Every structure is written in C-alpha cells, then in structure tokens.
C-alpha cells in the first residue's frame, strides 16, 4: 500500500535546452540570454534550429495492490495526477528577439500543456515458467489543456508600425478565457490582456493501456519489452475555446525620432486570434513511450548488468535514449543501481537509484542529477535532461515468489 502522495512522485524534463543555454551569470546574478550584458554571439551560439523542452509529472494519490495465493500473480489499483508540457522554439525566434531585427520569417512555434486524472488497474501473471505478462488499463479524466501553434510568422517594421502576416491557432479546454471585442462586433483573443478561469467539471475523457512482458531466456538473462501510455483523451466541445490567426495585422506605437526608429521592441502579446466557434471536440493521443531492456545476472545473482533502450514520442519529435546500468543487490531487500545514459545523441547523464524494501517499508529513489552541477532550486545547469522518481509504500504479507530462491542466493 502506497503512502498517499508520497507513494509515487515522478518528474521528468528533457529536450535539447539546458539552464545554461537560457540563463547567464552577470555581476553575481543570473540574467536571461536577452539581457543586454549577454552578447548575441554568446546567447545564440548554443541554440539549435529547433529548441525543444518538455516536462511531465506524475503524482500518485492512492495506490494499493496484492499478490494472489500463488504469490506470482499480482493486481493493483492506483489513482494519479498527470501533468505534461512541451514547447518548440525555432532559432529564428531567438535571433529576432536578441538582435532586434526589423524583419523576420519565423516558422513552427509550438507550445502545449495538459493535466488529467488517471485511474489505473493493473494485472500481471506468469504465462509460462519463462514468460511473465502485465497489462494496465487506465481511465482518464481531462482537467485542462492548452495548445498554441504558429506555423508562419512574417514580421516587418514599417515607418511607424509593425506589419504581421501570420498563420496560427490556439485551443484551450477546461479553461474559460476572456475574449475582446472589436468595433465591428467580432471577438478575438489577445495574450496581452486576458483572464483565465477554470471550468466546473471534467473537460474530457479517455482511455489508455500499458503493456509489458519479460522473458527469461536462461536463468541469468532476462529480456523485457513495454509500451506505456498507448491511448487518447477526447476533449469535449462544451469547454473548448478556439482562436485562429490567418490574416495580416498591424501594430502602431513604434517611436521615431529624427527619422530614426528607437526601441522597436515587438510585443508578441499583441497578436490577435479571431475567436472561432468550436463545432466539435478534439481527440488527442497521449505521449507514448517504448522500453526495450535486457539484464544479465552475475555472481550468484547479486550483480545485474542492464541495458535499456527508451523511445518517447512527442508532438514535435521522437526522442531516443540508451541507458547502461549496474545493479547491486547483495541482500534480498536492498538494491543499489548506477547508470549512464546517452540522451538522444546530444548529451549524457549519470544516474543513481536505491530501493530498500525490508518487511516494514518499501522505499525507492532514483535520479540522474545527483552529481551534476545544479542551481539552488536543484535544476541541472548543463544537462538537457532531469529525472527524479521517489516513492514510499508499506508492505503487507509475504514476499513474491516470482524469482525462485535457488536463483537468487545460491
């Protein structure tokens, strides 16, 4: 049985941006790359054509499970809060803002976030002496979501105004966003001045499954395969706000002195999205992940050598990670793991994990940022990935018989 809230907390952040790419130390304090004390060459030097960042969080509210009489078949139920966010910001956007250019062509700006409740029932059982199967069915209740996509943004500074030719949209579910009204009566959304209020009741429903299998090739070698979050959420049109930006816009207010432009800062908050009445809801797939692993046991099953290949499917890109690990389990109720990960061919991370499960408690903690440099807020400075998982549970009853004793400690 899991301790409420502390039974399982998981926070993952990944992409190709690090804190050191966004913040720079200047005179004893941190400033953003847009600060005037950070040169354009330094600020833009570490950026890529597509700069991506994603975060997902899972918090276990309730969790419990039990083995059946054979002590090999296991069922469980858990209730989780899930939150996800991701963004893609092209290099041309940073170049335009940092260098203060008078014109720019910017494509493919994307940002999205969603929050939902997950009620899951899991069941795992031995199919044969060598094959063990597991499945989890998950009923999803959508709380809120927001998505902004600007496919094309052509910006040009004219004599005393910014001229914009853009193609973009935004959607919001489960949240009520205030709209503005033009003199002709048409409504529009502007991020420069708006209020957002939560709607009462669920904004959508969905279903997903997790599937997994392990295969004991020989007593010392186990292969594993799993697919997680294979499913969708259908967001109803009742709580759906939608805006569209498909026409040219012009913003005045540029200061001109003696024929020269001064302080021509562009305010993205002034972009206007025409309000569009939603004719139907929106169905979106979840972020699916795939894991393929292998572990080989040595020294009477007290040390395991592992290899894990992970694929995560995002809206903007699919990420591939490879992790090698060494697992030490000198006694039945304690495991210490060290790992080294290759992150999408662009970085690396060293991880540590501990699992202690004596008769009265089950505690686990895993992270890949213990030894890397980090901010006072415990954010990694140079790494493009951050993963933290922890949980506390209370064991009740006898241990599992899934791993035969003659293989564990001969």
Q: Language-model features: where?
A:
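Subset of outer-membrane beta-barrel
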Residues: 1-410
